[in-house]
Amino acid sequence: MTTADAQDPEFRFLPGDALRAGRTAPLPPVTRVSASVGEGRRLSGLSFDTPAAPRIVALHGAGLNAHSFDPFLLALGAPALALDLPGHGRSDWRADGDYRPDHLADDVATALEALAPEPVVLLGHSLGGLTAALVAAAQPERVRALVIVDITPGLSPARDAGAVTEFIRGQRSFADVAEAVDRAIAFGIGSDRAALTRGVTLNTRTRADGRLEWTHHLAHLDAPATGADPAGEDPQPYAPIWASLQTVTAPILLVRASSGMVSDALAKEWREQLPEATIREVSGPHNLHEAAPVALAEAVASLLATAPDRT
């Protein structure tokens, strides 16, 4: 295990994250943890407020990592676990390069058995949201409530997420952090240079030739398998997940970003498919947990406090 230390490069952004989150209390203990998920692979994550059992588990989107939740979890202030999805952050890459939600869900469910012994609020952003939906459907006893951030099973990658897909699959190396930040801004990933610099720094590594490359596996695959079909032959590859969501008995909250991926049409479809679920809109772009951590924490806090226990 590695515990947060201001001198450790991995955790050097935490004091600034706390300021952005409006946190005045001392930083909680943050520990790097991991669990075996089979095939010789391990899933890595960050445990906040160790050694308390997590009350919320967070799953990031494609091309991100557990550290993307640091500002949000500091704002929320609850014991938490943020996982690096397979092929991301410090989690091992899949030999088959297959990062579809169903494969991710199997690994996440296995990791939760080891790292989250009590039922949790399960939150997933983007690809992590689809993954969380499948985990909640398959293991209802482990999930007190489900929060999905800015994605629905009705999303069409070609129509709704083309810029993000191209950003992940496009340029693979950079002269420095500034060049990667410039590309992120150009693709509408964000506009706050300081926040983007933090994110890029925590999501890149230096190659032998001195150039930077992304740490996640998706940037190293010619056709990363996330369920999205770049040829557009399956315009709604995630649609079968609606059926899984309809079996979830825990409360479900969709948090929609005001300038994100969930269009009015997708929000309407959500209401038709899941009339008992709740929708809240938060001002900000797709990566709300990075761009609007306090507002997202406010949207989630009441559900965290009121979600029914699982016995």
What would you call each of these model-derived segments?
Residues 1-54, 77-78, 118, 301, ...:
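Alpha/beta-hydrolase fold catalytic core
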Residues 44-90:
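Conserved HGGG/HGGXW glycine-rich cap/lid loop of the alpha/beta-hydrolase fold
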Residues 118-159:
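Conserved hydrolase catalytic core segment
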Residues 284-297:
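Catalytic histidine-centered segment of alpha/beta-hydrolase-like enzymes
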